[in-house]
C-alpha cells in the first residue's frame, strides 16, 4: 500500500459506507481513476452540474456520507475557475425581528409588488443600495454586526453561535475541485484535486471576514401577509480559498 495513503488513513481514520460499503482506500482509488479518465461531460446543466456529476461518478446519492464514528462527512465540489462564491453556511441574524427591520429600511419593490432585499455585505466598507449608502459588516469583540452608515446595529450574530453553526455544518469535509470547459449541456469537468478538511479555524474565519474575503449575502423576501422571509443569509467565500477556514488540510488527490 502507498505510504501516503496509509498515513492519511491512519490520521483521519476515515471509512465510507456508501451504498456498496465503499471504504476510504477504495474511494481514494476511485478518485484517482476519475482523475485519470480525464474530461467528463456534465450530468446536469447549471451550477449544480458539478456536484451531480461527481456524486454519480462516485455512486453517491446525496452530498454527505458517513465518516468517522458514524458522523457525517460532507462532500463539496467546485469549479477551479468559478466566479460564483461558495456558501459556507446560512444563519439568520439576531434579534428575531432583525430581518423585518432591515427589509423595512432597505428593501425595494419586487416584480410581485412585495418588498425584497438581495445584497452582499463586507467588513471593509458600506455597500450601495439603489445609489445610497447601505450596510456593512462589523467584527466586534463578541459578535458580528450589520451596521448602517451611522453605526446603528440592525442585526448581529454571536461569535460563539457562528462557530458552533460552522462546526455542525462542516465538521469534516471532502472537497473536490475540477477544471471546467464549455457551457450548458456541453460543459465538461476534469476532477483532478481533492482535499480532506477538518478542524474549523474560527480565528482565521474572523480574519478572512475582516479582510473582505468572506462576504455575507442577504436574501430577504416577503410573504403575502407582509412578514419577511429569509431566503438564506449566507456567509460565502471563493471556492479556491475554502481550505483557509480549516486548521487541518490534507490533499488526497
Predicted regions and their residues:
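Nucleic-acid endonuclease domains
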Residues: 1-71, 77-253
Amino acid at each position: 500500500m502507498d505510504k501516503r495513503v496509509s498515513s492519511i488513513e491512519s490520521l483521519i481514520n476515515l471509512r465510507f459506507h456508501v451504498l456498496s460499503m465503499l471504504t476510504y482506500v477504495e474511494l481514494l482509488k476511485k478518485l484517482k481513476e476519475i482523475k485519470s479518465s480525464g474530461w467528463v461531460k456534465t450530468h446536469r446543466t447549471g451550477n449544480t452540474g458539478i456536484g451531480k456529476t461527481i456524486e454519480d461518478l462516485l455512486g453517491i446519492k446525496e452530498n454527505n456520507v458517513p465518516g468517522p464514528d458514524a458522523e457525517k462527512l460532507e462532500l463539496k465540489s467546485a469549479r477551479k475557475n468559478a466566479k460564483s462564491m461558495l456558501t459556507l453556511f446560512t444563519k439568520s441574524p439576531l434579534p428575531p425581528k432583525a430581518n423585518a427591520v432591515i427589509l423595512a429600511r432597505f428593501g425595494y419593490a419586487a416584480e410581485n409588488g412585495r418588498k425584497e432585499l438581495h445584497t452582499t455585505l463586507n467588513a471593509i466598507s458600506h455597500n450601495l443600495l439603489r445609489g445610497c449608502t447601505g450596510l456593512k459588516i462589523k467584527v466586534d469583540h463578541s459578535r458580528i454586526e450589520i451596521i448602517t452608515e451611522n453605526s446603528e446595529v440592525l442585526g448581529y450574530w454571536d461569535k460563539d453561535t457562528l462557530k458552533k453553526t460552522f462546526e455542525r455544518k462542516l465538521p469534516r469535509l471532502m472537497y473536490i475541485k475540477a477544471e471546467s470547459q464549455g457551457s450548458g449541456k456541453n460543459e465538461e469537468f476534469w476532477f483532478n484535486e481533492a482535499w480532506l478538511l477538518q478542524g474549523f479555524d474560527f480565528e482565521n474565519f474572523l480574519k478572512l471576514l475582516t479582510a473582505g474575503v468572506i462576504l455575507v449575502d442577504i436574501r430577504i423576501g416577503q410573504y403575502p401577509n407582509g412578514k419577511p422571509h429569509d431566503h438564506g443569509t449566507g456567509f460565502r467565500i471563493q471556492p479556491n480559498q475554502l481550505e483557509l477556514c480549516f486548521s487541518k488540510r490534507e490533499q488526497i488527490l
